């Protein structure tokens, strides 16, 4: 119900503000369903926990109150972090990603708002009144089996697990350093598609449909009536031929070579006229309109038109860099050289994709660190929250590099979106642990209880997310399929990070929530008369009491 309402709101908003749909926006309904269901799962788990711990009378109402009290703040934070994960992609310079980011950001906010309003209402009307008594035979479900393996490893090899995880992350981060950006529209489709086959057939019969220009500019008037300068055009074209990646190049030199051959015979085939006067005479045989694409009216500028069929921006940019170095050597200091073209401008924007995603990732991690540090009144809380977020991302980028999957408009978004989603489980786990620490001084027992309470919804929601993203693998668009596969893998990695690594760290650190400090009820007269709490602010007194342990 919450997902259907969110989908209606989202597409209504897109139509109202005039944001167009694209191949990435088509994923939004699936994202709303799988991501929205995770909060429903955590709320249902808290509701059932409230039924188990609350009184029998008015059990449904008391369970809803319990749910609101214990999961309200964590849920607000998870909605915020998930929204930030999508919103950070607004920093991209690519309209395709910006439109998707806007739609997904609104969808996450709308889903959070609808879930907070609708879910308690539906539970009050259709929720259980009590939890059935357990049967004599206890059955282990999938979350229980996973946690039994994790708990065995945590109790016996905690240090080894941390060391192995650190080594794995270092290895995959090293692999991630080999990632590259590409903007290849043809790679958006499987190779067996008719469109790809037709494009290959056209390339076999015609020169490349893509064009860029090599422009040379001299300070001297009529510089490109000098044979030595025209020879520079010819030398550049010879290097283009040697690169063996372009279909054809045309310049003023080709026109002059053709006329020279027609006048002087095959003995001078491929040769330029030897004097400036001869060049001027040959130019008189050409209409001005025939030369507009190759030389300016004052002959200070000359162009080489290069036709090619390289659609992969990463490959083309490598050849362009090599070409620019050679051109600078050929033309010397007396001329300026430029390599320009519409597809090169698009490629430069694509290269900025890497920078934009690094900025978005850094911004999101800083925001999560600050939010969690404020929530737990300590930088340690922010650091702990980042650990299970960094591990899946490091593994994902490493796998991308190992499998030679480039950064493109689809895969570039996985990191920030996955962090925003994966951190949800961490927030619920830390919030539950923080609550249980008030009841016991045994941190290990508090961690185990928190994991037991939060593992089922966390595992179920992560697996549901993995399946939800995994459905996108069957998309006809390659970048959407890659996005789905990587996001699904990241969700599974987050189970490992949240339930194996985070509990090991939690047993060694005590956290106090800001909400607990602000909501704590204390007798000010008693505190003012306490020698131990003298010269402390009210905030410091509250935190000292909450972090203290009582031993008999």
What are the residue ranges of the model-derived segments?
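Envelope-exposed proteins and targeting segments
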Residues: 29, 210-212, 245, 300-302
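Membrane-embedded transmembrane helical bundles of large multi-pass transporters/channels
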Residues: 1-184, 311, 328-520, 524-525
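Generic non-transmembrane alpha-helical segments
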Residues: 205, 235-245, 322-334, 446, ...
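Regulatory nucleotide-sensing modules
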Residues: 528-552
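Solvent-exposed, non-transmembrane loop/terminal regulatory segments of multi-pass membrane proteins
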Residues: 150-152, 178-224, 239, 272-295, ...
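Alpha-helical transmembrane helix bundles of large polytopic membrane transport and channel proteins
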Residues: 243-285
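Extracytoplasmic
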Residues: 1, 231-234, 278-365
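Hydrophobic, well-ordered secondary-structure elements that form the walls
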Residues: 202, 214, 240, 249, ...
């Amino acid at each position: 119900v919450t997902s259907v309402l969110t989908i209606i709101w989202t597409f209504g908003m897109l139509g109202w503000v005039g944001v167009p749909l694209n191949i990435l926006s088509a994923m939004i309904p699936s994202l709303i369903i799988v991501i929205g269901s995770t909060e429903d799962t955590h709320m249902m788990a808290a509701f059932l926990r409230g039924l188990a711990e609350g009184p029998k009378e008015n059990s449904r109402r008391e369970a809803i109150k319990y749910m609101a009290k214990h999961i309200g703040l964590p849920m607000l934070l998870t909605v915020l972090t998930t929204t930030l994960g999508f919103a950070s992609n607004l920093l991209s310079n690519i309209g395709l990603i910006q439109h998707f980011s806007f739609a997904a950001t609104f969808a996450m906010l709308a889903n959070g708002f609808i879930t907070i309003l609708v879910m308690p209402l539906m539970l009050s009307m259709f929720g259980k009144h009590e939890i059935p008594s357990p049967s004599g035979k206890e059955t282990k479900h999938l979350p229980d089996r996973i946690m039994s393996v994790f708990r065995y490893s945590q109790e016996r090899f905690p240090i080894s697990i941390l060391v192995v995880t650190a080594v794995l992350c270092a290895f995959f981060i090293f692999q991630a350093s080999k990632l590259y950006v590409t903007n290849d529209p043809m790679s958006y489709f499987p190779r067996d598609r008719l469109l790809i086959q037709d494009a290959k057939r056209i390339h076999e019969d015609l020169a490349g449909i893509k064009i860029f220009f090599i422009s040379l500019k001299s300070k001297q008037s009529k510089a490109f009536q000098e044979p030595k300068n025209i020879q520079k055009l010819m030398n550049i074209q010879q290097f283009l031929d040697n690169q063996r990646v372009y279909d054809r190049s045309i310049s003023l030199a080709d026109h002059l070579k053709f006329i020279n051959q027609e006048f002087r015979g095959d003995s001078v085939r491929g040769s330029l006229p030897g004097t400036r006067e001869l060049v001027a005479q040959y130019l008189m045989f050409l209409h001005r309109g025939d030369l507009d694409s190759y030389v300016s009216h004052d002959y200070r500028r000359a162009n080489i038109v290069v036709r090619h069929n390289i659609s992969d921006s990463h490959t083309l940019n490598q050849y362009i860099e090599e070409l620019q170095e050679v051109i600078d050597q050929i033309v010397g200091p007396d001329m300026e050289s430029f390599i320009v073209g519409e597809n090169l401008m698009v490629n430069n924007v694509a290269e900025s994709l890497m920078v934009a995603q690094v900025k978005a990732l850094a911004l999101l991690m800083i925001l999560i660190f600050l939010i969690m540090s404020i929530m737990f009144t300590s930088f340690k809380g922010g650091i702990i929250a980042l650990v299970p977020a960094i591990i899946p991302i490091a593994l994902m980028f490493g796998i991308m590099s190992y499998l030679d999957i480039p950064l493109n408009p689809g895969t570039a978004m996985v990191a920030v979106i996955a962090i925003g989603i994966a951190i949800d489980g961490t927030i619920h786990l830390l919030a539950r642990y923080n609550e249980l620490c008030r009841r016991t001084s045994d941190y290990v027992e508090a961690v185990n209880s928190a994991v037991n309470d939060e593992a089922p919804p966390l595992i179920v929601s992560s697996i549901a997310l993995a399946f939800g993203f995994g459905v996108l693998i069957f998309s006809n668009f390659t970048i959407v399929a890659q996005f789905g596969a990587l996001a699904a893998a990241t969700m599974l990695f987050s189970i490992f990070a949240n339930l194996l690594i985070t509990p090991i760290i939690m047993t060694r650190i005590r956290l106090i929530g800001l909400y607990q400090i602000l909501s704590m009820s204390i007798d000010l007269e008693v505190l003012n008369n306490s020698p131990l709490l003298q010269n402390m602010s009210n905030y410091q007194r509250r935190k000292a009491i909450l972090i203290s342990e009582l031993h008999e």
